[in-house]
A protein has these predicted regions:
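NAD-dependent ADP-ribosyltransferases
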Residues: 1-260
């Protein structure tokens, strides 16, 4: 008997318009600052924006809700590609659980030890490593971000099976990139755009055509438009054969909802 899996062999990155798809195919992925709430750690109401590229590990047959929440456009790449690039599944956490309390306690201990200047360098490094782990955490469920605060649709985030790419802390430090933005900085649209532009010029999450398993567009009418865009943006970089294979991987949202 063949073994079946709940997860997919493809990591999907969803977006809300075809221009974003074309931009990714042209310039590859770049991290963008996204708001996250760490209230689930307890004892704090921390809300900050972290640079990341998000994916979901959901089979096409179960992707309807994700399309409704995140848009009818997506690029799906092989999970092998994701693992090779250091993309990691999110650790979902429940407030007041033993594991969440353990993380919170470690953070509190590190903060207290920072008062000792002799230990400051070691503690700073430990704090960086801990933050790097925490940035891959997400509450099991809660309100989604809605323009200015977390008062959007109540969502069981666990069902999204999120994977994240977050830039390595050494790269962040080398290029003097902000590891996170305070909420006020994120809400400043002009400032946020400058932060996103800076990081996109330095950090790329690259891929090859063979890594792409699906390109999802909202309607079949857009497939021919995307054909032409692929010819224009990849013609100098990829062979005609690879471009033609890539075109066969375009599918519409309607096909998914009707056939899977």
């Amino acid at each position: 008997m063949n073994k079946t899996y709940l997860s997919a062999n493809t990591l999907f990155h969803f977006t809300n318009n075809i221009d974003n798809i074309i931009n990714i195919l042209t310039n590859e992925f770049s991290p963008r600052y996204c708001m996250e709430s760490f209230e689930f750690l307890g004892g704090c109401d921390l809300e900050i924006a972290i640079p990341m590229v998000c994916f979901c590990d959901i089979p096409l047959s179960q992707i309807k809700n994700h399309i409704e929440n995140y848009g009818g456009y997506a690029i799906g790449l092989s999970k092998e590609w994701g693992v090779s690039k250091g993309i990691n599944p999110v650790a979902y956490s429940i407030k007041n659980s033993l594991s969440t309390k353990a993380i919170s306690n470690v953070i509190n201990i590190i903060n207290r030890e920072c008062e000792d200047e002799q230990k400051k360098n070691d503690i700073d490094n430990a704090y960086d490593f801990m933050c790097n782990f925490v940035f891959y955490m997400k509450p099991y469920e809660g309100n989604s971000w809605n323009k200015e605060k977390f008062d959007g649709k109540y969502t069981r985030f666990y069902d999204e099976r999120e994977w994240r790419y977050i830039p390595d802390i050494d790269v962040i430090k080398k290029y003097n990139i902000d590891w996170f933005l305070e909420k006020e900085e994120f809400l400043d649209y002009k400032g946020r755009r400058e932060y996103n532009n800076k990081i996109s010029e330095i950090i790329k999450l690259s891929f090859e055509p063979d890594d792409i398993k699906y390109i999802i567009v909202n309607s079949e009418d857009e497939i021919l438009d995307l054909f032409r865009a692929i010819d224009n943006i990849k013609g100098d970089k990829y062979s005609l054969n690879r471009i033609n294979i890539l075109k066969t991987r375009i599918i519409s949202k309607d096909q998914i909802l009707n056939d899977f």
